[in-house]
């Protein structure tokens, strides 16, 4: 029970991390971001969750998809895993990075940019994510 979560919640979180980021060190940072957000009552904001909801339950693949799996609009974890996960994703949940990050964005260059404040996050989005963060962009799973 890392960070006081159940094994089922750890698996759910690992499944989100699996779909969000491929790099082990970034997975650990994203796990830390997610734990911090859960502790502070901030939605996870994981794009992989609304993409999953759209693929499985229908609806547009946008951040406004009205699904209980969409962590852009709902707090906490979704009701269950959104994919299979690797040992590295589960390792990230068990051993998250020790940082103060609260935000991250995957840039158009597929690099993850981590920040601590919303202002820094918005600046990173504006600088590194002009295509894939644009309104109307349809992400592919």
Model-identified regions with their sequence ranges:
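Bacterial extracytoplasmic/cell-wall-associated proteins, especially those involved in peptidoglycan
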Residues: 1-141
């Amino acid at each position: 029970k890392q960070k006081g979560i159940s094994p089922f919640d750890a698996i759910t979180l690992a499944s989100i991390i699996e779909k969000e980021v491929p790099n082990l060190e970034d997975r650990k940072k994203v796990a830390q971001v997610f734990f911090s957000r859960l502790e502070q009552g901030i939605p996870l904001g994981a794009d992989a969750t609304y993409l999953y909801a759209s693929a499985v339950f229908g609806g547009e693949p946008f951040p406004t998809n009205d699904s209980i799996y969409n962590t852009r609009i709902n707090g906490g974890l979704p009701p269950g895993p959104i994919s299979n996960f690797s040992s590295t994703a589960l390792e990230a949940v068990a051993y998250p990075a020790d940082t103060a990050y609260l935000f991250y964005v995957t840039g158009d260059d597929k690099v993850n940019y981590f920040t601590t404040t919303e202002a820094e996050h918005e600046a990173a989005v504006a600088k590194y994510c002009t295509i894939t963060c644009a309104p109307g962009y349809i992400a592919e799973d």
